[in-house]
């Protein structure tokens, strides 16, 4: 029972500690938005190629 207050205090201290990024940011890190933009661009290119081949104008 004597350990319970210490345990509660430790939990409160851990919960209120500022969050820190586990690894430092490097020059190779890219924002997630750029990955989404790249994926959208690639999908658009593939859709354009598929539509073109269905019409058989550029195959």
Curated annotation (Swiss-Prot):
Keyword Secreted: yes
Transmembrane regions: none
Positions annotated as propeptide: 23-48
Broad class of the protein's primary localization: secreted
Signal peptide span: 1-22
Keyword Cell division: no
Domain notes per entry: The cysteine framework is V (CC-CC).
Protein name per UniProt: Conotoxin mr5a
Organism: Conus marmoreus
Lineage of the organism: Eukaryota, Metazoa, Spiralia, Lophotrochozoa, Mollusca
